[in-house]
Each structure stands twice: as C-alpha cells, then as structure tokens.
Amino acid sequence: MSSSGMPDLPAPLTNIKIQHTKLFINNEWHESVSGKTFPVFNPATEEKICEVEEADKEDVDKAVKAAREAFQMGSPWRTMDASERGQLIYKLADLIERDRLLLATLESINAGKVFASAYLMDLDYCIKALRYCAGWADKIQGRTIPVDGEFFSYTRHEPIGVCGLIFPWNAPMILLACKIGPALCCGNTVIVKPAEQTPLTALHVASLIKEAGFPPGVVNIVPGYGPTAGAAISSHMDVDKVAFTGSTEVGKMIQEAAAKSNLKRVTLELGAKNPCIVFADADLDSAVEFAHQGVFTNQGQSCIAASKLFVEEAIYDEFVQRSVERAKKYVFGNPLTPGVNHGPQINKAQHNKIMELIESGKKEGAKLECGGGPWGNKGYFIQPTVFSNVTDDMRIAKEEIFGPVQQIMKFKSLDEVIKRANNTYYGLVAGVFTKDLDKAVTVSSALQAGTVWVNCYLAASAQSPAGGFKMSGHGREMGEYGIHEYTEVKTVTMKISEKNS
C-alpha cells in the first residue's frame, strides 16, 4: 500500500486466456439462440481477442424470464433479509478486489485503458461503489404518516422489479458497478447489456456473481448490439425499468421505446459538452493541471470531460502556453507497457470521428497549438491536441468530441461566461476555478449542470449523486438519490378503531 492510501501498482498479467465468452442467464452459461457470435478487438493492436456469443431478442426473452422468476413473491431473492442482500454485494466487491489484477488487465486489453488507470482508478471506484451500495441494503426505510381520521398510514420502498441496465465502452467496470450496485441493494433483478466493444470484464464479473452466491436469475448478462439486444430490453413488456448511459441520440430512442411499450421507468445519463471556467484569480498551476486531466484522462473518452474550456482574458496566453507544454508530455504505446500514459481510442469509427472534428477546427479558424494527428502505424491512437482562438460557433466548441482534444476559449466578464457556458443543449458537469468565494458560489449556482466542481475536476465519488440537466439525461446514479431511483414508494393506509397520539 502506498503512502497515498492507494494499492501499489503490480505488473499486468501476461498471456491471459479468455475464459468467459457466453451469455450468463439464470446463473448458467448459454450459447446464443441464433448461434451467432461477434468479434472483440484490442484497440491498441487492432487484433481480435476472441469471439463472444451475440445476444438477440430471443436471448433477452430468456434473460427476462429468468429475472422475472427470480423476482416472484416467495422466491429466495424476495424473501432474503435486506442485510443478507448487502452481504452478497459485499462478497461480490471482495471477489472483484481479489481479481483486481485480472480485471484491470482485461480492461486495458479490451478497452485500451492505460493499465495504471484501470487498476488504480477504475477498479478502485468499482469496488468502493459496490461497498457503498451494500451498506445501503438494510437502511432503505419508509415512514409513518400522521394522516387525519382513524387511520394508520405508512410508506414502503419496494424494488421496481426487472431492470435493464445498458452501458457503453469507455468505463466498463465503473459503469457496471454504478448500475448493478443500486439495483441489487434495493432488491431488483437485472438484465445487463455491456457494450459490444467491451464485454469481457462484465462476463468475468458474471462468474463472480455466481461465486458470491446470488440466487439464479438475479443477475443476467447478455452481450450484444444496441439495435438488437439493447432495443429488445428497452421495448420489452416485462422489463420494469431501463437505465442507460450513452449518447443522447440513443437515449431518445430508449425513452421512446420505453414509452411505447409498458411505460417502464427510465434513467438516462447521456451526452455532454462540459464547461470549465478559469478566472484570472485562480491558482494557475492547479487550474492547468485539473483542466488538463479533465479532458485528456482516458484519451478524452469520458462523458464528464472538461470539453469546453473558458479562460479569462488576463491569463489566457499563459494558460494556453502551459496547457500545450503539459499536453506534449505523453508517452504513447500499448497501455499495458510500463511508462505508457496515453492509449488508443476504442475503435476506428471513433478515431475517424475525432479526426474529422479536429480537421473541422483547423478549417474553421482555430489555432492548432499541438497534436492534431494520428500516432503510429498500428492501433487507434490520436495525439493530444490543443486548440486556441476557439469561438463558440465552431463545431469543436459545440459538439461532444469524446477524444483527446482541448479547445480553449477566451472570456472577459462573469456574466458573459455564464451565458456562454449555459448556451448548450447539455448539462452534465461543470468546473469553476477561482479564489473568490462569492464568485464560486454565484457561478456554481448559475451553471445548468448536475454537478459543479469548484477548484477541482473529476472529483466523482460513490457517495455523491451524478446526473444531467437538459439533454444530458434525467435521474441520478449513486449517492442516496441514486439508490432511490431503484425503488417504488407504496403508501399503505389501514382503518383502525381508535387513533392516539
């Protein structure tokens, strides 16, 4: 254990044999009904890792049936003490911690994450999130209500039922924990669809679900494509809730499918273009580093990236200079290699989309300060890119890039920057850097975002709720608010012969 409290960084595993490639339904491994499989690739080498069974509508039906049976009244899961549910989630967290090295290595191979980041950050958050949710299992309580008349009234927080959980490829272990932790601690059963690009860690966790002792059907994991498996979950008449993290475009489709089917409950965490505002009185060293990490962590593949950076005019030139110097310090290569701190984008499609947006920045008049091109002959690498002289009407200032591209815009006044920062369809997170407390309070109150970080960035924790305003989605994940997204409140009122205070 290091002095910072983080575990020491071991070497990644070598020559991993992929053990789990089938669908996990009812605590058993299944081939797909259609017999189809799909390839999974290493984005650093472009090599195929393995083939994984491809879930389709028929497989989703099987998973939903198993989940529904596990949720029936009188089932082992429904009759289990809440404290025991919590113990199962604690056990799962312990098993993930036991297999932390394997999971971090898989995450690096399959998702292109720098190994140190996967091991120290992603797996750390995953384990903490599950333990946080485990602690909530026997603390979800209703209330007694002093209603008028000779009645006794109280509320129950009941599990919603069968929940479909769909998440993307950029942080598979974090997103898995943020979905299954709250759902399971409240007593729901789940159908998990990991991204087709990165299913391997979720499938390993499936084996740990069984090892931990969860009853059959409580957790089902069905890798597949969005238009087939994802659509089947979203439109299924026997799924009671769907929680989705991904693009706004797909989020709209999921909400529409939910409405047109059984009006299932929906939680959405969608796209973003997050403002990060640096005032002239900020600690410049700290602001440069936080803003830098905010956009370049995980090669910019983050919904909470600091992708719309506003810097006050008086410090603009120095801020740009320091940001460029910082962006030039990366070491590229296979993310499993010691010393490498910049990995690939997830696939060719994402790589090409990012490069197209970089080219748009050049054509629309932004000044390319560094980067701006691909790197290497193999893998989907893009150089960390910094643009200055960016204006609000440019595509790189308006569109979610989801890549290692920092665009730095200039502002003159507080009122101006608040208006510009809010001039977006999105509202997920924001950052503010200033030593002036009044300014910090004013700006954080005015920004239309679900999370505002002051003099920090990427300071996410399992104890705090996360979610978006506007087209960044609705509902919250993690924290107490995120737990209650997975319950229905029932009021029970009974007639009594006499009521006394």
Swiss-Prot record:
Residues annotated as binding NAD(+)? G246, S247, T248, E249, V250, G251
List of catalytic residues:
E269 (proton acceptor), C303 (nucleophile)
Give the classification, highest ranks.
Eukaryota, Metazoa, Chordata, Craniata, Vertebrata
Cited function: Major component of the eye of elephant shrews, which in contrast to other mammals, possesses both a lens- and a non-lens class-1 aldehyde dehydrogenase 1. This eye-specific form is a structural protein of the lens and, in other part of the eye, serves as the major form of ALDH1. Can convert/oxidize retinaldehyde to retinoic acid.
* Subunit note: Homotetramer.
Instruction: Provide the free-text tissue specificity comment from this protein's UniProt record.
Output: Eye specific, with very high expression in the lens.
Q: State the pathway, as annotated in the record.
A: Alcohol metabolism; ethanol degradation; acetate from ethanol: step 2/2
Enzyme's top EC category = oxidoreductase
Would you tell me the protein name for this molecule? Aldehyde dehydrogenase, cytosolic 1
Q: What Gene3D superfamilies does UniProt report for this protein, alphabetically? A: Aldehyde Dehydrogenase, Chain A, domain 1, Aldehyde Dehydrogenase, Chain A, domain 2
Cross-referenced SUPFAM superfamilies, in alphabetical order? ALDH-like
Q: What is the superkingdom listed in this entry's lineage? A: Eukaryota
